[in-house]
Amino acid sequence: MVMAAKKGPGPGGGVGGSKAEAEAASEVWCRRVRELGGCSQAGNRHCFECAQRGVTYVDITVGSFVCTTCSGLLRGLNPPHRVKSISMTTFTEPEVLFLQSRGNEVCRKIWLGLFDARTSLIPDSRDPQKVKEFLQEKYEKKRWYVPPEQVKGPSYSKGSVSATPVQGSVPEGKPIRTLLGDPVPSLSDPASTSSQPGSQSQARSSSQARSSQPPSHSSTKKASTDLLADIGGDPFAAPQVVPAFASFPGFGVGQTPAHGGFANFDAFSSSPSSSTFGSLPPSVQAPFQAQPTPAGSGQMSAFGVAPLAAASQPNNLADVGGLLGPRMAAGGLPGSVFGMPSQVPALQSAVPGVSGSGGLPFGAYTNPFATPAQAQLPSTNPFQPNGLASGPGFGMSSVRPGLLQPVPPSGAFASPFSAPVFPTQAGLADQQNGSSFGDLGTSKLGQRPLSQPAGISTNPFMTGSSAFASKPPTTNPFL
């Protein structure tokens, strides 16, 4: 009955009813279009042309959702596209069904199916001219067009979809494996999560082991960089006294006084055992001290130390004399290195007014380079000759020489000689007279009394006729 009333030409009733039904149907389709425009699964929330969020128009020609700006550009194409507003127009059932079958996602597969992002670029939406040129390439020239028959339904492959970039569309979610790498545990699988505690505990223990290693490394590094750790003792303590010159054990080592003035010259002192320069006893007396020896002894000394009753105060120069002048026990004939006559008990002072035997030469001052002489004899001026019957003043006096005797080229370091070089004089109690450097081991010369005048001069700078004229020329280093 109702259907018949509507179909019938009743007065006013049928037309009004159909109009209301058409409006109701149109409202339903419009609501459906708005639902499609808000559908996020089809990518309709963003403009198909410029990817701007918030679509307001529908392109009925291609079945896509666009923004207001792009809708004006689509109308300017050739042929122009048919565009409708979502909220201000009505849609028919075929239009709604067409929009349902297309949408932005399907339109992208059709119109941008051959698009390659490596060779082509989507223009910036803020430049209308470039967007227009892009639309002309896409719709008028169909540069990247793919027939709809190849993209219908689910048969469309994902490879072609990924090859076509979507401007303004939401980027597809990438799996967490691609972002974090392969060894990523599953977040939803309960079986895998239940099996993870063991592996996590192992990983945690390994990480703790690695975290515990750096301190040990740092400690070893600290120990290795501590260069002064092995140096013992106080760095501010006084250094140990070390001799300035090394000891020469090849020449024999003798006991010498320990003084800090000079180094240990053990090279020139020897033990009673045989050495390079003969048997020399160790020195046990203070420097420049001498003990009287029995008459007739042939002991020789380096500097010919005078017999002193009391030892003088040691000093730095005295240490040298003590080190270079070793003593020898009574009865020994071998001389020292330089072979000077040793102490004489009857030695007198060279200065008038001072006791003859046992006194200090030149008073209390012991000059190792002074030349003592007899008190009754005249002064031995090195620059004038005199009538001393004794030996020369430098190195050849029978009392004691003040300087070292020049070393002749022959027999300087010979073995110990067996007989005295010179006979004893009358006033010196059988003391040997002569120098150890004068032809060691030769025959004795004739005795000469102490008061006998002779032409021997004590001036080392002048030559004179003497019994020693046959000796080789002197090599005195002070001449």
UniProtKB/Swiss-Prot annotation:
Transmembrane segments: none
Residue ranges with Low complexity bias: 194-218
Residues with N6-acetyllysine modification: K174
Domain Arf-GAP: 27-153
Keywords for this protein: Acetylation, Metal-binding, Repeat, Zinc, Zinc-finger
Name of one Pfam family that matches: ArfGap
Region (Disordered) residue spans: 150-223, 450-479
A GO molecular-function annotation: GTPase activator activity
InterPro entries tied to this protein: Arf-GAP_FG-repeat_protein (IPR052248), ARFGAP/RecO (IPR037278), ArfGAP_dom (IPR001164), ArfGAP_dom_sf (IPR038508)
Ranges of compositional bias, category Polar residues: 157-167, 454-479
Zn finger (C4-type) start-end: 47-70
Domain notes: Contains FG repeats and 4 N-P-F repeats.
PANTHER family: ARF-GAP DOMAIN AND FG REPEAT-CONTAINING PROTEIN 2 (PTHR46134:SF4), DRONGO, ISOFORM F (PTHR46134)
Record's subunit section: Interacts with EPS15R.
Record's protein name: Arf-GAP domain and FG repeat-containing protein 2
Provenance organism: Mus musculus (Mouse)
